[in-house]
A protein has these predicted regions:
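Beta-propeller-forming repeat regions
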Residues: 1-186
Length: 186
């Protein structure tokens, strides 16, 4: 059994269940170990994903939610939909490239009771995202999500690069930064 501490990349502290104490959200997805320049990253590991650990109020944390996200690297936590609870947005630097639509970004809308509804972005925006931030970039009072591109061609299988170029319709030139503007609907 693989412990969730393996491949830990980031964590966030927030009250995900609304009980007044701080819970912990952990990102596991480090796939750099064993990677060799010019070779595809090894297959995703079973511990990769997003975990939320509920605080019982006495600083005992129990895993209450898990979402598999191959190669997860970073996350931001905020009440993006304005409903009073904390949502999660996360990126993967090492997604499962063999999928028809590799998941490189996920937004997990908190539905309460430690249940989250996953949403993603259009496939023409799939890319090797290595940074994520939350900020009101257009000044409308709602927190948006900003994704930053990493230039790591050695991490992407050659056949997927060809498919990615065709999907994008821009000759494979993903934007360096994209803004996911909050429309106030989650």
């Amino acid at each position: 059994h693989h412990t969730p501490s393996w491949g830990g990349n980031s964590l966030q502290a927030a009250d995900f269940d609304g009980d007044g104490d701080v819970d912990i959200q952990v990102i596991n997805g480090d796939n750099v170990n064993g990677n060799h320049i010019g070779k595809v990253v090894p297959a995703p590991r079973p511990q990769h994903g997003i975990r939320v650990f509920r605080n019982d109020g006495a600083l005992k944390f129990t895993e209450a939610y898990y979402y598999r996200l191959h190669g997860a690297i970073r996350s931001v936590v905020h009440d993006f939909d304005g409903d009073g609870d904390q949502d999660i947005a996360a990126i993967s630097l090492f997604p499962q490239w063999t999928y028809d639509e590799p998941e490189t970004f996920v937004y997990l809308e908190n539905k309460g009771g430690m249940k989250f509804e996953p949403q993603s972005i259009a496939k023409e925006f799939f890319s090797v995202w290595c940074s994520i931030e939350a900020a009101d970039v257009n000044g409308d009072g709602r927190t948006d999500i900003v994704l930053g591109l990493g230039n790591f061609p050695e991490l992407v299988p050659p056949d997927w690069i060809t498919a990615h170029k065709a999907m994008q319709g821009r000759g494979g030139k993903a934007p360096s930064v994209i803004y996911l503007l909050n429309q106030g609907k989650g």
